[in-house]
Amino acid sequence: MPAIPPKLILASSSRYRRELLSRLRLPFTAISPDVDETPQPGEAPADLALRLSVAKAMAVAATHPGSVVIGSDQVATVDGEPIGKPGGFERAREQLRRLSGRAVEFHSAMAVTDGVHTETADIVTLCRFRTLTDAAIDAYLRAEEPYDTAGSAKAESLGIALMDSIRSDDPTAIIGLPLIALTRMLGRFGLDPLTGHPA
C-alpha cells in the first residue's frame, strides 16, 4: 500500500503565491501566518527575508502537526538598502522614480518544514528597470495599484512593462515563490509534484 503524502500548507495570504503553488498540482491549503515582520536592528535584507520565511512556516506548523508547511518572504533592495511596500500612490511614485534606470535585487526566501526538519532557500533575482517617465509611472500606478508590493512593480502582470531585464535561476522567484527550488525542497519531505506520491 503506497504511503499517504503529508498534508501541504502554504503559510501565506498572498493570492499570487497561491496561484504559483497551484501550478505544481499538489493539493494544499493556505493559512495566513500571524508573524511580526518588523526588522531587527542591523538585520541585512536577505537575513530578514529568510528569518521571516522560517517564522511564517513554523508559526503554522506549530498548530498543524504532521503537515508540511511552506513559508516565504521577499525583500527588494537597491544599493543594499531595503525597499518596502509603498502603501499608497505618492510613495509608490517616489519608489519608481528612484528605481528608474537602476538595478534592484529581490531576495525570495523560502522555508519548508514539517515542524521537526526545516529546509531553506534564498533565490536572488536581479531586475533592471527601464528609464521611466513620470507619465509612464503614473499610468502604471493607476492601472495596477501595486501598493502592497515591494518596489511598487508587479512583474507577474503589467509591471513587467517597467523592466528592462530580469536575471534569476528561477523565473517564478520574482513573483514570490521560487518553484524550481520549492520542487526540490518538497521532494525531501516526500512530496513529488509529478507523481503526487512520496519522492
UniProtKB/Swiss-Prot annotation:
Subcellular location: Cytoplasm
InterPro entries per the UniProt record, alphabetical: ITPase-like_fam, Maf-like
Annotated EC: 3.6.1.-
Catalytic residues of the enzyme: D73
Location, primary (coarse class): cytoplasm
Entry's Gene Ontology cellular component terms: cytoplasm
Record's keyword terms, sorted: Cytoplasm, Hydrolase, Nucleotide metabolism
A Pfam entry, by short name: Maf
BP GO terms, sorted: nucleotide metabolic process
Gene3D superfamilies registered for this protein in UniProt: 3.90.950.10
Enzyme's top EC category: hydrolase
Ranges in a coiled coil: none
Cofactor(s) for this UniProt protein: a divalent metal cation
MF term (GO), any: nucleoside triphosphate diphosphatase activity
Reaction catalysis annotation: N(7)-methyl-GTP + H2O = N(7)-methyl-GMP + diphosphate + H(+)
Site (Important for substrate specificity) residue list: Y16, Q74, E156
Domain of life: Bacteria
NCBIfam families according to UniProt: maf
Family note: Belongs to the Maf family. YceF subfamily.
Protein task: Nucleoside triphosphate pyrophosphatase that hydrolyzes 7-methyl-GTP (m(7)GTP). May have a dual role in cell division arrest and in preventing the incorporation of modified nucleotides into cellular nucleic acids.
Protein name as it appears in the record: 7-methyl-GTP pyrophosphatase
Organism: Bordetella pertussis (strain Tohama I / ATCC BAA-589 / NCTC 13251)
